[in-house]
């Protein structure tokens, strides 16, 4: 199949399904004009007793969508990225011109892509338009296609209140705006989004109609806590075990780490790699991969960002929270591989939100950790990362420290990883005691050769 590619921002979104019995058709807001043009039996695969029937009818009457030919709509088929661009472009055109006339082309979506690029609905780059769109991609395009005033706030959704969306994400502003406007409200009872999930043509119709018809927007309140079992189910496969080896391929230690991008960028402690010549990660499904290089190593914050030799590009990821919001007494969880017991979950509280040790500040916590837990995520009550477990005081009980995750945003991260063998000298000193003291200027050392784009810019 012919491939046309473009990179767009990834945004997390999901649709609340409203039964058709509760559906209320009405004229649209602002410049959206509702013109009854949908006839009985317009689409042979859309029955009036199906939850999405009213949404499909309204979306058609607003001029947002058309069928797929031969009297079909294919409501359950996954929306492709090309189709998502078409919908967002048509919505914008209808809003500003009361029409959506685009020339025919092959592939059909190319005139819409040109329009979307012109009006900043999508960004430049490579992307497979024939691949399924994620809820994230679709939501971001919907928000970027219209003026902010269309999305009037009806819900109080504070920053970091959505369990798996951070305001710091590229798509964060779009998602929080759509939550607050009641366009999207999550795909489970906890309001989580699942950023890489796909979206059906029926679900996309529902979202678009909520934009045009405020009567269908969703009022909701997000929970302050999510049960531990639900957090574990959502994130367990984003956490893995690390094993490091010396030059003779003898095991040195085991530790923990977690994915921060779906393409396999991962985060752990820097000290995990002390004296290491190579390292592997083992996922919960048993798959083992080599660590091939590092996007960042920062001794000052004790963080290392690395990639593995996997071609898979849809890893589950953890959401980075705001460690400044962690308060003494808050419920927290640690998820890692203590004593090689993979993905062991423990719970406790923040014992001190700002514990000073040797001139640096850490989160002190009481969730039990052991050897092998280093580098594992410290999670808040929503399952967001607020720290990276660092050390435990052996002379006490559950006296543990974690590096606050907000330090991550001060780390310069290269898009292209520097090969493991090229940075081995950083690990040979052990615990950051090399010639560069407590901070190594990784970006200046390797940036000219390997930097393409910093994920923290």
List each language-model region with its residue ranges:
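Catalytic nucleophile loop of clan PA
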Residues: 369-389
């Amino acid at each position: 199949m012919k491939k046309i590619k473009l990179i767009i921002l990834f945004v997390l979104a999901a649709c609340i399904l409203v039964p058709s019995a509760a559906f209320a058709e009405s004229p649209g807001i602002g410049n959206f004009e509702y013109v009854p043009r949908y006839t009985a039996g317009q689409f042979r695969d859309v029955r009036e007793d199906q939850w999405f029937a009213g949404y499909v009818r309204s979306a058609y009457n607003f001029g947002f969508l058309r069928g797929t030919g031969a009297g079909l709509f294919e409501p359950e088929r996954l929306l492709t990225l090309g189709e998502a661009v078409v919908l967002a472009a048509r919505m914008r055109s209808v809003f500003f011109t009361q029409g959506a006339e685009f020339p025919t082309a092959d592939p059909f979506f190319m005139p819409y892509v040109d329009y979307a690029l012109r009006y900043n609905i999508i960004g430049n780059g490579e992307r497979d338009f024939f691949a399924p769109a994620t809820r994230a991609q679709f939501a971001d395009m919907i928000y970027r296609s219209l003026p902010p005033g269309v999305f009037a706030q009806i819900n109080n959704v504070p920053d970091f209140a959505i369990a798996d969306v951070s305001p710091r994400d590229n798509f964060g502003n779009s998602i929080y705006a759509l939550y607050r406007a009641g366009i999207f409200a999550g795909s489970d009872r906890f309001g989580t989004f699942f950023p890489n999930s796909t979206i059906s043509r029926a679900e996309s119709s529902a979202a678009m109609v909520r934009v045009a018809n405020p009567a269908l927007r969703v009022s909701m309140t997000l929970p302050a806590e999510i049960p531990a079992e639900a957090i574990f189910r959502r994130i367990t496969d984003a956490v893995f075990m690390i094993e490091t080896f010396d030059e003779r391929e003898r095991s040195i230690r085991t530790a923990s780490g977690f994915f921060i991008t779906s393409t396999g960028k991962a985060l752990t402690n820097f000290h995990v790699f002390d004296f290491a010549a190579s390292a592997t990660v083992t996922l919960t499904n048993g798959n083992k991969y080599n660590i091939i290089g590092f996007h960042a190593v920062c001794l000052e914050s004790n963080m290392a960002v690395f990639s593995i030799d996997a071609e898979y590009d849809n890893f589950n990821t953890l959401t980075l929270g705001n460690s400044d919001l962690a308060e003494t007494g808050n419920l927290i969880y640690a998820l890692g591989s203590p004593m090689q017991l993979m993905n062991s979950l423990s719970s406790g509280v923040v014992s001190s939100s700002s514990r000073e040790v040797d001139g640096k500040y850490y989160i002190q916590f009481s969730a039990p950790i052991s050897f092998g837990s280093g580098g594992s995520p410290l999670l808040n009550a929503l399952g967001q990362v607020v720290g990276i477990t660092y050390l435990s005081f052996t002379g006490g009980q559950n006296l543990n420290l974690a590096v606050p995750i907000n330090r991550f945003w001060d780390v310069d991260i290269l898009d292209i990883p520097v090969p493991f063998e090229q940075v081995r000298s950083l690990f040979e000193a052990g615990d950051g005691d090399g010639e560069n003291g407590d901070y190594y200027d990784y970006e200046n050392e390797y940036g000219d050769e390997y930097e393409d784009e910093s994920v923290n810019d």
